């Protein structure tokens, strides 16, 4: 059985943050990430620290953030113990990299990725640990070839870890990034997994490395293809309207957002995923046979790619 190595995970996650920021800056060609390093002393709630990095007003990206955090607490919040009651009364550590990129151009999809590690410990008992993460894509004006490329890259990431891993984590992603009150998925999905500890520690760790590094391989070629596509006010207005769904999901359903807010996490870092602008419109209906209608008809429901 492989040894649990928290320090190795932390070091890797910090390197992954550096690597992803570098590649996104290269793709943007103008903006750089501004780092806000933070630290909290342990107290009644979360202690720890992190590096919040935000990019604004680039050539390609209107706003985006790539966060690293490593926090500790004496008791898990309700959002975590609700489905894992055995965690009650254990001190815990949580560390991860989380990112969201909101592009200017409506033809470039919004993207999200996350890899994380949790460990909950109690004197005299075996630790409870798991990994989680994934990446998902939210296009406004989807192209079939882009969606297939995204999912084919996800399949390649999963292939070394088992024949059924992609299918399982793709289905989990479709289920997780779903807005019941809207009856639609947030986007076209990708990969999502949580509570990953059924393999040995080293294999689980290798999998989150593959997912973390696979994100840029899946996303940047799509950005490169679409970032110079011409668009007008109509496309921009629709992009802002659809960003509203992103806000709704993150504030109502997202487990990471709820965990962070309920456990007293750093609010500015938690809400970094919010788009800089979004809009809502009462009783919006896309025009029949329009590109906007195509999004609803063909892409906001689970599909096999």
From Swiss-Prot:
- What GO cellular component entries does it have? cytoplasm
Which residues take part in binding a divalent metal cation?
A: 102, 112, 151, 181
Important for dimerization, annotated site positions:
181
What keywords sit in the KW lines?
Cytoplasm, Heme biosynthesis, Metal-binding, Oxidoreductase, Porphyrin biosynthesis
Gene3D superfamilies, per database record: Coproporphyrinogen III oxidase, aerobic
Q: Where in the cell is it found?
A: Cytoplasm
**Which reaction(s) are listed as its catalytic activity?**
coproporphyrinogen III + O2 + 2 H(+) = protoporphyrinogen IX + 2 CO2 + 2 H2O
Chief location of this protein within or outside the cell:
cytoplasm
Biochemical pathway = Porphyrin-containing compound metabolism; protoporphyrin-IX biosynthesis; protoporphyrinogen-IX from coproporphyrinogen-III (O2 route): step 1/1
**Record keywords: Cytoplasm included?**
yes
Which Enzyme Commission number(s) are on file for it?
A: 1.3.3.3
Which PROSITE patterns does the UniProt record give? COPROGEN_OXIDASE
State the active site: 112 (proton donor)
Q: Which InterPro entries match?
A: Coprogen_oxidase_aer, Coprogen_oxidase_aer_sf, Coprogen_oxidase_CS
Q: Which BP terms in the Gene Ontology apply to this protein?
A: protoporphyrinogen IX biosynthetic process
Q: Does the keyword Transferase apply?
A: no
> Annotated region Important for dimerization: where?
246-281
What would you give as a GO molecular function for this chain, any one? Answer: protein homodimerization activity
Q: Which residues of the sequence carry a binding annotation for substrate?
A: 98, 114-116, 264-266
Q: Which HAMAP family match?
A: Coprogen_oxidas
What role does this protein play?
Involved in the heme biosynthesis. Catalyzes the aerobic oxidative decarboxylation of propionate groups of rings A and B of coproporphyrinogen-III to yield the vinyl groups in protoporphyrinogen-IX.
Q: Which family does it belong to?
A: Belongs to the aerobic coproporphyrinogen-III oxidase family.
Its assembly, as annotated, is:
Homodimer.
Q: Please give the name of this protein.
A: Oxygen-dependent coproporphyrinogen-III oxidase
């Amino acid at each position: 059985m492989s040894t649990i190595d928290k320090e190795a995970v932390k070091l890797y996650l910090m390197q992954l943050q550096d690597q992803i920021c570098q590649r996104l800056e290269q793709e943007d060609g103008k903006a750089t990430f501004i780092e806000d390093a933070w630290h909290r002393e342990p107290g009644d709630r979360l202690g720890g620290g992190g590096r919040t990095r935000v990019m604004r007003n680039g050539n390609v990206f209107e706003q985006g953030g790539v966060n690293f955090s490593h926090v500790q607490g004496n008791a898990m919040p309700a959002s975590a113990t609700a489905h894992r009651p055995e965690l009650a009364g254990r001190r815990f550590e949580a560390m991860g990299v989380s990112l969201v990129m909101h592009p200017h151009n409506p033809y470039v999809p919004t993207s999200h990725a996350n890899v994380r590690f949790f460990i909950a410990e109690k004197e005299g008992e075996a630790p409870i640990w798991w990994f989680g993460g994934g990446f998902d894509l939210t296009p406004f004006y989807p192209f079939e070839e882009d969606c297939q490329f995204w999912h084919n890259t996800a399949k390649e990431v999963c292939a070394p870890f088992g024949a059924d891993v992609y299918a399982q984590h793709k289905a989990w992603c479709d289920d997780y990034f779903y807005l019941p009150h809207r009856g639609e998925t947030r986007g076209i999905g990708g990969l999502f997994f949580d509570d990953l500890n059924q393999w040995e520690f080293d294999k689980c760790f290798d999998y989150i490395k593959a997912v973390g590094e696979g994100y840029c391989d899946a996303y940047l070629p799509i950005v490169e293809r679409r970032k110079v596509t011409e668009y007008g006010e109509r496309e921009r207005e629709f992009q802002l309207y659809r960003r509203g769904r992103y806000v709704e999901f993150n504030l109502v359903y997202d487990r990471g957002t709820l965990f962070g807010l309920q456990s007293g996490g750093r609010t500015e870092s938690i809400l970094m995923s919010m788009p800089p602008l979004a809009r809502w419109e009462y009783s919006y209906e896309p025009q029949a046979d329009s590109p906007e209608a195509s999004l609803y008809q063909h892409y906001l429901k689970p599909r096999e790619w």
